[in-house]
Amino acid sequence: MRHYEIIFLVHPDQSEQVGGMVERYTKLIEEDGGKIHRLEDWGRRQLAYAINNVHKAHYVLINVECSGKALSELEDNFRYNDAVIRNLVIRRDEAITGQSEMLKAEENRSERRERRERPEHGGHEGLDGDSDKADE
């Protein structure tokens, strides 16, 4: 069996169906003796260019080890599912199990956003209060 990295984009109006689609696709691979090494739901993202007048899509990344038969069946599912607007299958030399760069960047962004929104109580307030007392 070979290793593949699969990314597919789902129409934003069908985002609520992504969970069922992922479940169906992983079941297809596992029933054929394949293995899921990594599964990441990147959520809705802006497209670099419009596809059929759609400017956003729901991204899903799956790293699998599967047979050619399972892969061709998966590609057929992508082709005949109107909700999947694009897909990309890349053959890899080995299984990739770590977090993707895309997910790491998203986590870093959310951490920075949380730090920015969370008020700091580290001593900035004390300095302002002391200067007010000194003026009296």
Swiss-Prot record:
Q: Which GO terms describe its molecular function?
A: small ribosomal subunit rRNA binding; structural constituent of ribosome
Q: Which InterPro entries match?
A: Ribosomal_bS6, Ribosomal_bS6_CS, Ribosomal_bS6_sf, Ribosomal_S6_plastid/chlpt, Transl_elong_EF1B/ribsomal_bS6
What GO CC annotations are associated with the protein? cytosolic small ribosomal subunit
- Task performed by this protein: Binds together with bS18 to 16S ribosomal RNA.
The protein's matches in NCBIfam families, at most eight in alphabetical order, are given as: S6
Write down the Pfam families for this protein, in alphabetical order: Ribosomal_S6
Record-level GO BP terms: translation
Task: From the Swiss-Prot or TrEMBL record, give the protein name.
Answer: Small ribosomal subunit protein bS6
Q: Which spans does this entry mark as compositional bias, Basic and acidic residues?
A: 103-136
The answer to whether UniProt assigns keyword Endoplasmic reticulum to this entry is no
Any idea which UniProt keywords this protein has? Ribonucleoprotein, Ribosomal protein, RNA-binding, rRNA-binding
**What family is reported?**
Belongs to the bacterial ribosomal protein bS6 family.
Region (Disordered) residue spans: 99-136
Q: Which gene encodes it?
A: rpsF
